[in-house]
Structures are given as structure tokens and as C-alpha cells.
């Protein structure tokens, strides 16, 4: 009887709700992405059999499958956590110094040249997806290494959970909020147009031309020129991408760190997990928005800077979140968030200004070239900042500390 009573009073293991959420939502997102990727890739494959241009469809499909596969790893680790099992050795961190993965970066020029060459051929649908994954994955691995080098180890579940958050949770929240913001900016633009009969006529002409079918780029540029030349519409256009979008995305990107604030977590972990979450956010953009054979190489190179910016901004906010929790002071958190918004906003502004300059002669010609120089400086500066903050937060004389739970 005493044994029975003792057995009944044994404490039950508490449910790890974060792991449960990662397993359920991450698994659902993974299945959705893989399903979308398979259907897109198969459709592209049929296009090839029918001698129709299919490279972009196959590339997009395989990219979705890759993103879904990464989420499956995160969901699998969450399942192991729920079952009380350890992560496989392949995914578990190892102690000791690791060789810097600089060869990954040194291989990039060869990958870019090969990808550019392949993208001009009929074999692009078959060969470009693999080169695209290497061109996106190699710098991502190097940047993550740069953010966490010589730091105490972090459990695989946390690292992969942060990546999964950046791949699924943060983009999902961002899309909802940006949709609402987009409606508000659109309504503001329509309200402004309602006071200008001439602009309303131009808008009607645009809709009429679009209803006829896909216009040529020259025709579309000519129709959009009055809108691009209008100062108020230009401010709304740039304001959405350079103000509203950064405020929203920098709010949701460190979601992984925010969810861990009720658990033991250090400022170093906040920076690394924030950076990894930003890497996931940038990876999803690279895999979806860079899935084109037209201008493949320049687009892939440009999006490397985007990933670095996403990582440094989310890393800054992630570290500041943990510090604010520890000190119960929020001045640095606000400063870090506004700095992240400023960096992201400047990047987006430099990316959209050339669009206006291409559409209208009302803007100086240097707006076509100068922003790209600023983008290059921002991308390089973000990489330097990642390394500098890592060095500043790096513990002295640490060979390997226990993993955080």
C-alpha cells in the first residue's frame, strides 16, 4: 500500500509549452511550406516538359521545401524536448574551438559566377536551385558563426527555435500588421487623389491599361510616371517601406527572445538568438524574393546585405530585451529598437528611391546610383557591427560553459 501511495504522489513532468507550440505551429508551417513547394516545383517541371519557361517555378518550389525542411528540424527538436530526450549528436553543440568557416565565404564568387552562367541557359531549372541554396546558405552560416563565436553553448532547441521563429512566426505577424498598415497608407493615398481630378484620370487610365493584359515595361513606366512624380504620393510610398515596415518588422523579429524572457537567458544569448531569428527572417526573404532567373547574381549579392541588416537589428533588440528584463530599465531597449528601425528604414529607403528615379525624370539622376553605394556600406557595416558586438559581449577565458536550459 505504501508503495502504491508513493507511486501516486510522484511529481509529473511539467509541459514545456514553448516546445509544444514550436512542435505544433512549426510542424504545421513546415508541412504547408513543403506542400506549397512540391506543388510549385511539380508545376514548373511540367512547364519544362511542355517547353515553357519553368526555371523560376522549380526554383521557388525547392526554396519553399528547404524552408519547410528547416522548420521540420525545429519541430523535431521540440518533440524530443517534450519526450524528455536529448538532441542527436549531429545537432548538439560541441565544446572546444571550431575552425572558422571562412572557406564558405571564399567560395561565394565561384558560386555567383556559376549561378549567373547557369541562369542564362535552358538547364537553369535543374542546376540553379542547388547553386541558389549554396549562395544563400553559405553566407548565412558564416554570419551566424560570426555572431556566436567563442560564446558559451546554447541548446540546439533554442537555436533552431529562434531560426524557426524567424522563418515562420515573425513573418506571419509581420504580414498581418503590414497588411493593415498598407491599407491605411492606401486609403491615405486615395483620399489625396480624390482632390485631384487629373490624378484620378491617370488612375483610371492605369486600371484600364492593366485590364487589357500585361503591359510592356515601357508602357507601364509611362503610365506610372505622374504618380512617381507627385511629392505626396512619393512620400507615402517611401514612408510605407522606410518607416511603417521597419517599425513593424523590428517589433516582431525578436519574438523568439521575447518568448524566453520568463526563463534563464543571458544578454549574450539574447544577442545570438535575436541574430539567428533575424537570419531566419532574411533567409525566408532570400528564398522567396530571390527566386528568379532574371538578374539572379546581382539580386543574390544584394540580399546578402539584407540578411546582415536583419541579423544585426534583431540581435541588438534581442540583447536589449534581456538587459531590460534584468535591470528593469527600458531606456536602452527603446534606444536599441529605434536604432534597429533607423538602420532598417535607411536600407529600405535606399532600395526604393531608385524605383522612383527610374519612373520619373523629376528626381536627380544620381538617385539611381548613389543608393546602391549606401546599401553596400550598410551591408558591410552590419557585418562589422555583428563582429564588434560579439567581441564586446564575449566572455574572457571561456572554453565552454554549461548549456542554458
Predicted segments with their positions:
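Hydrophobic alpha-helical segments at protein termini of multi-pass membrane proteins
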Residues: 1-405
Amino acid at each position: 500500500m505504501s508503495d502504491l501511495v508513493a507511486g501516486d504522489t510522484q511529481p509529473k513532468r511539467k509541459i514545456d509549452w514553448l516546445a509544444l507550440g514550436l512542435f505544433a505551429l512549426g510542424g504545421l508551417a513546415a508541412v504547408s511550406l513543403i506542400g506549397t513547394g512540391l506543388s510549385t516545383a511539380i508545376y514548373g517541371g511540367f512547364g519544362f516538359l511542355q517547353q515553357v519557361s519553368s526555371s523560376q517555378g522549380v526554383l521557388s518550389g525547392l526554396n519553399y521545401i528547404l524552408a519547410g525542411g528547416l522548420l521540420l528540424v525545429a519541430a523535431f527538436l521540440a518533440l524530443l524536448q517534450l519526450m524528455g530526450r536529448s538532441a542527436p549528436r549531429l545537432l548538439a553543440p560541441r565544446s572546444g574551438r571550431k575552425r572558422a568557416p571562412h572557406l564558405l565565404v571564399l567560395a561565394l564568387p565561384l558560386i555567383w559566377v556559376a549561378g549567373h552562367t547557369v541562369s542564362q541557359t535552358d538547364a537553369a531549372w535543374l542546376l540553379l536551385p542547388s547553386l541558389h541554396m549554396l549562395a544563400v546558405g553559405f553566407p548565412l552560416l558564416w554570419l551566424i558563426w560570426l555572431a556566436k563565436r567563442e560564446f558559451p553553448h546554447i541548446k540546439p532547441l533554442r537555436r533552431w527555435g529562434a531560426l524557426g521563429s524567424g522563418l515562420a512566426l515573425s513573418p506571419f505577424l509581420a504580414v498581418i500588421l503590414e497588411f493593415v498598415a498598407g491599407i491605411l497608407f492606401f486609403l491615405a493615398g486615395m483620399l489625396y487623389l480624390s482632390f485631384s481630378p487629373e490624378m484620378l484620370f491617370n488612375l483610371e487610365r492605369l486600371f484600364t491599361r492593366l485590364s487589357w493584359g500585361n503591359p510592356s515595361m515601357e508602357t507601364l513606366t509611362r503610365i506610372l510616371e505622374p504618380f512617381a512624380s507627385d511629392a505626396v504620393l512619393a512620400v507615402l510610398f517611401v514612408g510605407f517601406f522606410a518607416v511603417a515596415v521597419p517599425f513593424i518588422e523590428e517589433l516582431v523579429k525578436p519574438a523568439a527572445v521575447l518568448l524566453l524572457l520568463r526563463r534563464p537567458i543571458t544578454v549574450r544569448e539574447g544577442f545570438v538568438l535575436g541574430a539567428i531569428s533575424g537570419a531566419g527572417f532574411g533567409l525566408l526573404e532570400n528564398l522567396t524574393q530571390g527566386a528568379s532567373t532574371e538578374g539572379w547574381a546581382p539580386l543574390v549579392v544584394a540580399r546578402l546585405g539584407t540578411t546582415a541588416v536583419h541579423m544585426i537589428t534583431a540581435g541588438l533588440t534581442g540583447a536589449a530585451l534581456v538587459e531590460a528584463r534584468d535591470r528593469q530599465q527600458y531606456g536602452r531597449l527603446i534606444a536599441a529598437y529605434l536604432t534597429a528601425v533607423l538602420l532598417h528604414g535607411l536600407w529600405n529607403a535606399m532600395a526604393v528611391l531608385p524605383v522612383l528615379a527610374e519612373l520619373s525624370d523629376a528626381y536627380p539622376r544620381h538617385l539611381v546610383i548613389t543608393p546602391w553605394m549606401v546599401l553596400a556600406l550598410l551591408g558591410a557595416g552590419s557585418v562589422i557591427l555583428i563582429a564588434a558586438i560579439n567581441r564586446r559581449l564575449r566572455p574572457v577565458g571561456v572554453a565552454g560553459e554549461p548549456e542554458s536550459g
